Amino acid sequence: MVSTTQSRSLKAMGEEIWKNKTEKINTELFTLTYGSIVAQLCQDYERDFNKVNDHLYSMGYNIGCRLIEDFLARTALPRCENLVKTSEVLSKCAFKIFLNITPNITNWSHNKDTFSLILDENPLADFVELPMDAMKSLWYSNILCGVLKGSLEMVQLDCDVWFVSDILRGDSQTEIKVKLNRILKDEIPIGED
């Protein structure tokens, strides 16, 4: 488990990096730009929201594969020894550094391979109201799941990441579930020493 001292230290690190080492853009510009991307995808895929979800996830995955390098360079954190520690780093550092939010970690499985992140606030969803035809199948912020999947994979954690609920869809909270499938082995590509 993660001690209270370690948890506070991670939170302080995330806040310090957010305040002093992160270039910031206007929140409204960020939110509206993301909204424009989602709206354009809905138009491009002729309101096939499953395809929009897949595209957002894929975009997020590609971002996550690169974002992890920036995160590790800024924090210089060592490899996490378990998923509990990883969840604390995600919540208290990564989300704080890149989105200035700190999701709550909850709903751990008994064997500690699955947990939920509860987003009390979601900067991607500000100023957003989903149309009725999108409320059942569009995961508006699905890019976040892709970012988590991509970044976790780059640190050798094969995880499934998905939305369970979203306030935009009329749910009481926004919840992202993370399930560890397996720890990947560091392997040297064929033909390289």
Swiss-Prot record:
GO terms for cellular component: cis-Golgi network membrane; cytosol; endoplasmic reticulum; phagophore assembly site; TRAPP complex; TRAPPI protein complex; TRAPPII protein complex; TRAPPIII protein complex. Keywords: Autophagy, Endoplasmic reticulum, ER-Golgi transport, Golgi apparatus, Lipoprotein, Palmitate, Transport. GO terms for biological process: cellular response to nitrogen starvation; cytoplasm to vacuole targeting by the Cvt pathway; endoplasmic reticulum to Golgi vesicle-mediated transport; intra-Golgi vesicle-mediated transport; macroautophagy; retrograde transport, endosome to Golgi. It comes from the Eukaryota. Part of the multisubunit TRAPP (transport protein particle) I complex composed of BET3, BET5, TRS20, TRS23, TRS31 and TRS33. Part of the multisubunit TRAPP (transport protein particle) II complex composed of BET3, BET5, TRS20, TRS23, TRS31, TRS33, TRS65, TRS85, TRS120 and TRS130. Part of the multisubunit TRAPP (transport protein particle) III complex composed of BET3, BET5, TRS20, TRS23, TRS31, TRS33 and TRS85. Belongs to the TRAPP small subunits family. BET3 subfamily. This is Trafficking protein particle complex subunit BET3.
